Amino acid sequence: MLNLTNVDDALHKGEEWLETNKKTFLSETETGISFKDNFADLLLLELSNRWDYPVIVPEDYPEDNDTNAVAFSILKPTDSRAKVLIDEILACKNADGIVQVHLDPNRPRIAPEVSANILSLFYSYGRGHEVQESLSYLQKAMALEEYQESRYYFLPEPLFFYTWRLLCIASGSALETIDNQRLPKELHTLRDHLIRRVSARLGTAKDNALCPALRILICHSLGIKNDVDLQLLLDLQEDDGSFGRAWFEGLDPSSARLHERGLHAARKTENNPRPPSDMQQRIHDPQMQYARWSDWPLAPSIARNDKGIQHDHHTLGSLESPRPSHDLLLLHH
């Protein structure tokens, strides 16, 4: 049986670690190159509701539909500004009607994780009916018994998380809640797939704290008892309150793995003051372009593209480079 005192202590230690390390969550390669990842920062912002934890980084967003979709579903700019982006995304459908990963039509790639994030954006603006082909593609991926590793992800939990996030948004609920009464009927099958897939993964990936953390979030909102993953997290917490290194995604095209300590610590704790009103005003400032956040604090950023992983205009890898015999480990600290 779980000791609730241990759970409370773990939450307190995790919150202290987040507070102590706010604005310092950097990615780092094993060769010592550090960078900020805006995609992880956006998810950290949504989960913690703390504007002072991440630094929302890029002077320009990377040219991919995934990051833009996540950003706009979290930051909620004006409807007119969002319409411009949504219309651009709609122009990126492939021959099957599935929205592609990149804004560039010369990069014809799709991924179920990206489809889930794009669907979240469209449903948040009442336009889910325009991307039903992407929904069908996501449902087929979730219907599988085994996870099919993709170019961008190597574990099923990120797919589960993005799907769960879609269900929360589409039902008009706050994150961490799925309102089954308001959930659109076309998403009921997707919800059932999520319940089945997550239930089958309980207690797995014992060396990656992010996996049980995501499953706990999902199970809580779906009414699934999950003490086994909670115990896993308690066992994985380190003395400083963090939860160690937890791999989250791969960096196309090098198959390098990404880890964000701040992001997965936030997924295990709750600390939710409201963002300051002046930041909300800046989001809705008519002078602010939809893909530009130049008035926000800037930090080195990476751009994920097929020409290589860019950092401060220096290429770290390229599509033509042979795949290394072992993964290049990219560690967010």
UniProtKB/Swiss-Prot annotation:
* Record EC number: 4.2.3.-
Class of the enzyme per the UniProt entry, highest EC level: lyase
State the species of origin.
Answer: Viridothelium virens
Region annotated Disordered sits at 312-333
Stated family: Belongs to the HAD-like hydrolase superfamily.
- Give me the reactions it catalyses: (2E,6E)-farnesyl diphosphate = (S,S)-drim-8-en-11-yl diphosphate
Which residue ranges have biased composition labelled Basic and acidic residues? 323-333
Q: In which pathway does it act?
A: Secondary metabolite biosynthesis; terpenoid biosynthesis
Keyword terms, alphabetized? Lyase
Q: What is this protein called?
A: Terpene cyclase vviB
Q: What does this protein do?
A: Terpene cyclase that cyclizes farnesyl diphosphate (FPP) to drim-8-ene diphosphate used by vviA as the native prenyl donor to catalyze the prenylation of D-mannitol on C-3'-OH to afford sporulositol A.
